[in-house]
Structure formats: C-alpha cells, structure tokens
Amino acid sequence: MAARMNNQYEERLGTERMLPLIFKMALPAVAAQFVNLLYNIVDRIYIGHIPEIGTNALAGVGVTTSIVILISSFSAIVGAGGAPLAAMALGQGDRVRAGKFLGNGFMLLILFTVLTSLASYLFMEPILRFAGASAVTLPYAEDYLSVYLLGTLFVEISTGLNTFINSQGRPNIAMYSVLIGALLNIVLDPIFIFWFDMGVKGAALATILSQACSAWWVLGFLCSDRASLRLQKCYLKFDRRIVGGMLALGVSPFIMASTESLVGFVLNGSLEKFGDIYVGALAILQSAMQLVSVPLTGFAQGFVPVASYNYGHGDRQRVKDCFRIVLTVMFSFNFVLMLLMICFPTVVASAFTSDPELIATVEHVLPLFLAGMTIFGLQRACQNMFVALGQARISIFIALLRKVILLVPLALVLPRFCGVEGVFMAEAVSDATAAICCTLLFFWQFPKILRKMQNLIQN
C-alpha cells in the first residue's frame, strides 16, 4: 500500500497539468528557501546591531561568507548532480539505479565534510586574510568560522540530500526540512547573541544547531518507509560510474556556487584596499542579492525534478511546456525585485545597519552593483534547465563564463580606471553579459537536445 502511494507521487510528475504541477512542486521549496533567506538576513541584522562592535562584526562575518559558500557548494555536486539523475532513473523505472545515486551521494557528502573542515581549520587565518579580513575584522571572522565548522556535516546533509526528497515528488517534506532549520535559527540567534552575550560565536552556534535539526529530519524521512527512494545500506558503496555521473552533472552547480566564493575572495580583497566600510557594504549587498537568488533557487528545486522526469520519460511537449513556464516566472520575479532595490537603496541599507557612513556607502554603490542582475533570471532559467536535461558540459561553461571568465578579471582591472566603483561595476557587467550569452546558447541547443531525446526513445 505504501509503495503504491509513493509511486503515485512520482507518476504525477508525468501526468498532471504542467502549470499547477510546477507551482505545486516549486512553491514549498520557494517558501522554505524564503524563510531560510529570512534567517540569513535576520542573522546579519542582529550582528550589525551588536552594540559598539556591530559594523566591524558585520564586516568580519561578511568575510566568512566566501568560505561558508565554498564549503556548502560541495553539497551541490550531490544535490544538483545526483538528484536529477535519480529523477531520470525513476522516470525510466530503474529504482535500483536511483537508489545508488542516493547512497553514493550520502557517502560523498561525508567525504567532502572531512576534507573541507580539515583544510579550513588548518589554514583558517591565511584563508580569511586572503578573503579580505583586516586586523580589525579578523577576530570576528575567526570567532564565527571556528564554531561554524563544527557543524559542517549537518549543513552538507541537509542541503545535499534534501533535493532527493523533491526528486520523488515530495516537495512538502523537503520544505519542512528547511523551515525547521530556518525558524529555529531565527529563535536561537537573539538568545545566543544577546542573552548569552556570545556575539558572532552565538550566531554560528545557532546556525549549526538548526542545521543539525534539518539534517535529522532529512535522514529520518529518507530512511523511512514513507520514502519511495530510500537511503539503504546496500547502496552505501562507491560505484565508479554512479559517482562519475554525479560529478559530471554536479560540477556545473558546484562551479556556480563555489565561484561565488572565489568572487567573494576577489571582491573583498579588492575592497579591503579602499577600507573596511566597503567590505561591510558588500556584505549588505550580497544579502540583498539573496532576496532574489534564494527564491529562484527554491523554484529551481521544484521544477528540475519535473523536467528531469519527463525528459527521462521521453515526453517532448511536457519538457517544452515546463521551460516556457520557468522562463516567464524566473525572469519576471528577478526583474521586479531588482528594480525595487535599485530604486530604494536607502531602505535596503537601513535594514542592516544604523551607521550613517555605511548607509551612505550602500546608497552609492547598490545601483552600480545590481544593474546587471535585472536580467539575470534569464540565465537562472536556462542554466537550471540545462542541468535538468543532463547537459553537463554546457552547464559547466555557463557557470565558468559569468564568474571566472568575466567577473574575476573585471574586478581586478576596472578599479584601476574607475576606483572603488569599478569593483561594484564588475558584477553588473558580468551578470548582464552572461545572461545574454546563456539565453542565446540555450535557444540554439534546446531543439537539438529534444531531437536527441526523441531518437533515443525511438531506438
């Protein structure tokens, strides 16, 4: 009986009307990610308002963002690389192969945790200095990161395996895992930061305790009879072909996430030369960008299983319908929110700090920084669709184009001609250029991908 109900959850990915199905799958993930975003923003707000040290503490924690992103990006190899392949396998009726993707993904997350935590502890100070920490902000950065690293495994599991819950058509269960961590974090933050007077260490402790609860929820579901795709002992053995497939497809989301870390190193390093006030401004701007990027990530988590399942099932029309809806929603949402932030920079800045100098700095650089992001929804839709369709090489190129090929060189060159404004302008130029290139590439390749799918089905 339970198996029949679980199969019904999967089958709806290939039978329900596309528009309500996508929103049914995506809205729980968007809601969960939005609450998670709220936690991140509230976290920064609390830190920024710590008496006497708020501005420097905010800059210090902002420096750690690059390292935190780099560590958590390894979960994208498993979550964004393994879950779509598991969904394709389910669409093809191959449950054993789908189970292997889940089991091997779990083992990879443990391996990534050991390697990243060890490296971060051994080289913490030089990494933080490279990321832009000054003599003033370094102590706050070290306080936060030293505690955060204790919970790396919880972060990897909760983010890396949650997408496997989505891939079996259970978005509500996946939503709860994020909500549990985010809401608990919002409650614990002021308790540890202010009541126990732990400062930034309290913020980090609240984070890892909350992520531990999320990880427990994810594992509890995946090991239970409620899951149609279960985490089983027989699949906890590395399979070279399974791991290779995950790495091939997951490299693109990993690069997309980890290059955010590389960019953080470069931007913070460039801004530190102009003063800690600009490093603090960047921390606020990155949080503002999350208002758009995090809900889009949630929407992607909802539609990717739908696209992957129907691609594996060979349903050309449903794949096309899925993309039309995704492109419209992602572009519209992204454009409207970015335009509002560009028009009202003072509101954005004042939410994070009461420092008049920092508010004035954010007002000046925010329009320069976010201008190119107005059309970034195009890239998010196209790139995530490439991932959903298993197009690893194209996804890798797109991920490299925006950050490594465009942004890093621009962030190093433009300040020589435009001063500190050049650092912020580099983001806008790279975002707009990459979005246009990605969209053109997708509309060139998409018909070829669909023809290849039809040929495979016919043969």
Question: Where are these predicted regions, by residue range?
Answer:
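Short alpha-helical transmembrane segments in multi-pass integral membrane proteins
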Residues: 1-26, 86-151, 195-251, 307-372, ...
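Transmembrane helical elements of multi-pass membrane transporters/channels
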Residues: 24-43, 147, 181, 210-214, ...
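Alpha-helical transmembrane segments and their lipid-water interface positions
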Residues: 32, 36, 40-47, 72-79, ...
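Helix-terminus/linker motif at the lipid-water interface of multi-pass membrane proteins
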Residues: 34, 38-59, 128-135, 191-198, ...
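Small-residue-rich hydrophobic transmembrane alpha-helices
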Residues: 58-118, 155-174, 281-345, 376-395
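Short runs within selected transmembrane alpha-helices of multi-pass transporters and secretion channels
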Residues: 148-166, 177-182, 203-216, 297-300, ...
